[in-house]
């Protein structure tokens, strides 16, 4: 089959690879929709991900498709079933799984390989995070399930209440999804981010106001403007993953407020905090990571009910054969929110 194989830092090659034979309890999915993701871009730039993927390996993890092969142990999953699968499944046995924190599982089993014609799904994922689609659900919509589940986890961690004022920092796909879910929670949402079109999309998705920050050099001035013109927010949802925006969250939240440090920074990154403000303002810092089987199902519910639509997030298309060029373009800063990768069949 054709697949995009990650060999190392900024080294992706589309080539013919053999399909892996299925083990008992596994299924194979013919991939009908695969989407780009900021995490995949990080993997492309760094050449690996300590938890998710070690090269050489087929990469990509947001996908939906149709079951094309089953093994006797995969009961209840017929060939032809339309499905979406998450990119991991917890063990169900460790301390964190037993305490309802499956996203922190000590033995998360990750699945990569969305940028290919098909993918073999391990038995644990079949059991825990393989979901049927309604006949009316499009594959492109369904492929949003995994990132939306991560955002749903982050929003749940914020414990939002109707009427709260929320600032989302970042207008990429994660920030846009956070905007939708915060608005759905009855909150008033403002967005600080880059890119005219992305900020326009934030408003279309329910943001009250948007604050442009077109270059990193503008960020200190943007903060001063924000602080001078606005009351601090009840909740700040950071969806960029840079020390400057993490630190900004602690400056823009009100006394007693909560900052969700959702955007992941590179390992070893340090940030500076005003300890006096942290202590005397009673701030809560919360970090959210990944998803659980519950939030995977919640995400698909939001998609199938029409709350989240691919049309609002997927604004680019690219054939699998051009994937290396696409990631180079993404690395250089193209402004697509998400791109659908189409398999050349």
Language-model features, listed with the residues they occupy:
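Glycine-rich beta-strand-centered segment in the early N-terminal region that forms part
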Residues: 20-34, 48-98, 132-134
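Residues in the short beta-alpha loop(s) of Rossmann-like NAD(P)-binding domains
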Residues: 195, 265, 291
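C-terminal hydrophobic helical "lid"/dimerization subdomain
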Residues: 247-251, 293-345
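NAD(P)H dinucleotide-binding glycine-rich loop of Rossmann-like/cofactor-binding domains
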Residues: 91-169
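Mid-domain Rossmann-like dinucleotide-binding core that forms the NAD(H)/NADP(H) cofactor-binding site
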Residues: 82, 138-216
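Glycine-rich cofactor phosphate-binding loops and adjacent beta1-alpha1 units
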Residues: 200, 204-284, 344
């Amino acid at each position: 089959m054709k697949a995009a194989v990650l060999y190392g830092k900024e080294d992706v090659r589309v080539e013919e690879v053999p399909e892996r034979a299925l083990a008992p309890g596994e299924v194979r999915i013919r991939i009908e929709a695969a989407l780009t993701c900021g995490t995949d871009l990080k993997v492309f730039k760094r050449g690996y991900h300590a938890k998710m993927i070690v090269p050489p390996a087929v990469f990509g993890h947001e996908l939906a498709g149709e079951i094309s092969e089953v093994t006797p142990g995969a009961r209840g999953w017929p060939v032809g079933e339309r499905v979406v699968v998450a990119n991991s499944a917890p063990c169900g046995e460790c301390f964190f799984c037993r305490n309802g924190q499956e996203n922190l599982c000590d033995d998360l089993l990750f699945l990569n390989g969305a940028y290919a014609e098909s993918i073999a799904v391990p038995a644990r994922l079949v059991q825990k995070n393989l979901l049927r689609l309604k006949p009316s659900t499009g594959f492109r919509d369904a492929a949003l399930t995994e990132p939306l589940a991560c955002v749903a986890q982050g929003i749940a961690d914020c414990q939002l209440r109707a009427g709260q004022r929320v600032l989302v920092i970042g207008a990429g796909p994660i920030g846009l999804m956070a905007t939708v879910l915060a608005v759905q929670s009855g909150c008033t949402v403002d967005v600080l981010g880059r890119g005219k079109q992305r900020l326009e999309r934030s408003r279309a998705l329910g943001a009250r106001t948007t604050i442009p920050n077109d270059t990193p050099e503008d960020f200190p001035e943007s903060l001063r403007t924000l602080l001078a013109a606005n009351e601090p927010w009840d909740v700040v949802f950071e969806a960029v993953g840079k020390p400057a925006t993490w630190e900004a969250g602690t400056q823009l939240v009100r006394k007693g407020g909560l900052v969700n440090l959702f955007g992941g920074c590179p390992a070893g990154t340090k940030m500076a905090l005003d300890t006096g403000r942290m202590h005397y303002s009673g701030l809560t810092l919360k970090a959210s990571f990944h998803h659980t089987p519950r939030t995977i199902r919640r995400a698909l519910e939001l998609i199938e009910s029409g709350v989240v639509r691919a049309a609002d997030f997927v604004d680019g298309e690219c054939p699998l054969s051009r994937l290396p060029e696409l990631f180079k373009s993404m690395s250089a800063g193209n402004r697509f929110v998400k791109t659908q990768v189409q398999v050349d069949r």
